Amino acid sequence: MKIINSFVFIFVLLFVFNTNAIKLSEDEKYSIEEKPEWYSIDSNFAVSPGKISDALGWGYYKNEILKDGWGKLYVEMNKFMTPENSSIYYEATGYLEGYLTWSTTWNYSQAYFQNYMNGTNESDIPTPLVEFLKINYDWMTSTFSNRDESVYDTQVSNVIYQFEGFARGYQQAADSDKQLTTLQLLLLQYAGDLEDVAGYLEYEMAQNKTEYINRVKSLKEIETLFAVKGRCSGLVRITPDYGELFISHTTWGSYFTAGYRIFKRIIIPDPTVPGNEILFASYAGVLTSDDDFFMIPSTEMVIIETTNDILNTSLYQYVTPNSLLYFVRSIIANRLSNTAQEWTNNFIQYNSGTYSNQWMIVDYKLFTPYQPLQPNTFWIIEQLPGGFMSADMTEVLALGNWPSFNRPFFPEIYDAMGYSYYEKLYGDIISYDLNPRSKMFRRDVPNVMSLDGMQQIMTQNNYKSDPFSGGFPGNAIAARYDLGGGPAEPLSWSFIGLHGAIDSKITSYSLLQQNQAIAINGMTVTPDCPPFTWNSNWSTVSAHYGSPETFDFDWISITITDK
């Protein structure tokens, strides 16, 4: 995606099972442990080396991106936190993250702004986007700051405190020649929302809105849209004996973002919220996940999503800056929800209509190995501008699995977002049931019986031999659009660019009991897909400051302990 000063947005980037057997911490293959360097923050927001027992909180950051693909951030606030003094703890949480991760955040910001804004200065950000940011942030702060009519209101305020603390922490720690403005740091939080904010601004500035809405996209445009904006593959899998329940997520994104991945464990012992500890995959400088992949040990829930791109541009009329963007709502839903249905209800409040996803929520509290699935174990919600639909899909999951692949499930959402219209025009590539990934999941998931099987399917790309790929490396559970190639038909399947699968994360009932996931960072590597390298052909196409040069990492265990 490029955002240029004329504000014409061009979204093309050149760019047999035993549950007791999963004990990854005992397997050298997954070992990542090195002693961390602790820092503590006091009530004056002074950061000192060491883990000080009477501090506001403490944490560490291990920048191991070049080692295994992931930074590891641990931030924990002190148990002395009360409802009356909660705001300072949320602010301190953000401050410590900004302080500890500033160097990786700087690298990510330079790549982010260069690739998305064509420049790294605040003046390079298009004026309409700056205006949207300011209107949205002013609305949020004026509506919710110092308002405590509900726990929800308080948590919106706490997200504001956390972000402002993050900005202060970054600015305090960063070198004088690597400073970022608060506006720039706020724009990093838009990583998920940005494309739909851009779509809304395009719609608003269209001279003839009727013509803009009614213009029919070509198959080439649709395929390019899916390639550069279609984000992620997801899978929830119950084994045939009901002995284990897996949930997994493979992020699709711009390749440069793979260089700044951080797994974060954030513990804020707020007595007013159930979700006070969260382990999630994220990026430097981003307070939420953006993938998304959240594990919430305190409520025993895991949440993932895949994106449903907006094909019906008339929906952008329902986007408004007077709303809560995804990055705020995701944090609040994680904190306030104790059940999957509660999560859907909390997430959809003040819906911005940006980052329209299919969200999947597994409530492991309701899961007992080798027993039938209980109602409300698994919910989904699909959001779009101006609306949403949600439902308990446990009965469907009980049949074996729930796959997710950037197509809306609910017929009403499918129709409203424009998919039914374009399916009639262009056929199976748009279809929920017959698109390549849908057929791959349907064919291959019955063979997945173990953690190894989950790893294999979520990084799968056999485009040279898989008939459902048709010779195209983008038609895979883990796409590799950089490789090129494709079938003779349709001729428009020719997109080549720096986009595709950039990671995979998996957890399960037994892993969640240990606060564990496994993860791999980098563009998928298979017999058909060699390791991606920032060679001379690609290095000038996409900024990637400080990124690993070659992505050929292994799976690792993610725990991020307090030891």
UniProtKB/Swiss-Prot annotation:
Q: What are the leading ranks of the lineage?
A: Eukaryota, Amoebozoa, Evosea, Eumycetozoa, Dictyostelia
- Where in the cell? Secreted
Glycosylated residues: list them: N85, N107, N118, N121, N208, N312, N537
Q: Which organism is it from?
A: Dictyostelium discoideum
Listed as disulfide-bonded, the cysteine pairs are none
Its recorded name reads Phospholipase B-like protein F
Q: What are the EC numbers?
A: 3.1.1.-
Q: Which GO terms describe its molecular function?
A: phospholipase activity
Query: For this UniProt entry, which residues form the secretion signal?
Result: 1-21
Q: Which family does it belong to?
A: Belongs to the phospholipase B-like family.
> What does the entry give for GO biological process?
phosphatidylethanolamine catabolic process; phosphatidylinositol catabolic process; phospholipid catabolic process
Q: Keywords in UniProt for this one? A: Glycoprotein, Hydrolase, Lipid degradation, Lipid metabolism, Secreted, Signal
